[in-house]
Design a protein with these regions (language model features):
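Conserved Radical SAM active-site core
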Residues: 1-94, 103-106, 132-140
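Alpha-helix C-cap/termination motif
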Residues: 32, 65-66, 115-116, 170-171
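A structural signal for isolated positions on well-ordered beta-strands in alpha/beta enzyme cores
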Residues: 39, 72, 95-97, 122, ...
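Conserved, mostly hydrophobic/aromatic
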Residues: 40, 73, 113, 126, ...
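Active-site beta-loop-alpha junctions enriched in small/polar residues
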Residues: 43-45, 76-78, 99-103, 126-128, ...
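Alpha-helical scaffolding segments of alpha/beta enzyme cores, especially the outer helices
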Residues: 54, 58-61, 83, 111-115, ...
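Short loop-to-alpha-helix "cap/lid" segments that border enzyme active sites
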Residues: 85, 89-141, 155-162
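Auxiliary Fe-S-binding modules of radical SAM enzymes
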Residues: 118, 129, 134-220
Length: 220
């Protein structure tokens, strides 16, 4: 997607995947009065090692000054996430999440996330690359599951998603099934739109209860 936006001449993506801080974007939520869910850094990671703490501080300042919005922040860099909030409080309107794509790298991130006192803590199991096995969802409020998209997408077995759904139901976490991605439930390759987002004949659209007064999401 970044390459496509670069070819289209979109200013923010002229450098492709090269890290590019855009402090001017931080004013947009202040101008928007209607309650909105923002997915922060949807194509990057706010806790990337090259993003200075000072910039993250600016992001958190904007978040605190716009309590009408909700902000989803997802990271694979759980160590830096923990270190950052070890000396700072988490804004009440922030949802903190970690990527949990597999057992080796993803599942261990859950333990650190659980220690951070965010109002909403969530897992993004997308792309789900294998059966995650037993999960401890204590302190986890929301779990997103989805398959991989793109030319090199790997298939997701339906049983992997079902296992997570069952554990969410048993442990009181809200379950959201986002998409099949490039491979359908039947194991056939097709467009993600054609594959849809039904699991066992229905959509699973669980969301944390705090979203009842917000609009559809916006990436930032």
């Amino acid at each position: 997607l970044a390459k496509r936006l670069q070819r289209m001449g979109v200013d923010a993506y002229r450098q492709g995947f090269k890290l590019n801080l855009l402090p001017d974007r931080l004013d947009e939520p202040r101008r928007r009065k209607k309650p909105t869910i923002y997915f922060v850094n949807s194509m990057s990671d706010l806790f990337h090692e090259r993003i200075p703490d000072a910039f993250i501080d600016q992001v958190m300042k904007t978040i605190r000054e716009t309590p009408q919005h909700r902000y989803q922040i997802l990271t694979k860099r759980e160590a830096r996430l923990g270190a950052y909030f070890a000396t700072r409080s988490v804004p009440d309107n922030v949802w903190l999440g970690v990527s949990v794509e597999n057992r080796r790298h993803g599942v261990p991130r859950i333990d650190l996330l659980r220690t951070i006192p965010a109002q909403i803590r969530f897992l993004s199991c997308e792309p789900l690359l294998e059966d995650l096995g037993p999960l401890n969802l204590d302190g986890i409020h929301w779990v997103i599951v989805g398959g991989e998209s793109g030319a090199e997408a790997r298939p997701m077995h339906p049983d992997w998603a079902r296992a997570i759904r069952r554990q969410c139901e048993a442990q009181g976490a809200t379950f959201f099934f986002k998409q099949w991605g490039g491979w359908g439930a039947d194991g056939q390759r097709r467009s993600k739109k054609a594959n849809g987002r039904e699991l066992d004949g229905q959509q699973w659209n669980g969301m944390p209860v705090t979203v009842v007064d917000t609009t559809a999401g916006v990436s930032a």
